[in-house]
Amino acid sequence: MKYDDNNIFAKILRGEIPCKKIYENDYVLSFYDVNPQKKIHALVIPKGQYTDLDDFVQNAKEKEIYEFFKAISHVAKMLKVSNVDGGYRTLSNIANNGGQEVPH
């Protein structure tokens, strides 16, 4: 699957669509979902052009991968849902059969 520069996450990363930012560094952006499925529903997305988690893990630099997963833990602590606060769930929808709606 080819990366689409006009997907909603790419537009959020470029600042064309606003988001309620939680955390950002050189590699990731985290923000609240506009249609939350739970009381706390945060997204953590890489800033690189990857279509899904498989593409990211296979093609990103080790530093990008490290910073992505480190950011997930950091955001969980910020939102007070880390393992010491009761826990959280991570989810990545991959491709059509995995329920992916936006290829990013």
Regions found by a protein language model. Name each.
Residues 1-104:
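HIT superfamily nucleotide-processing domains
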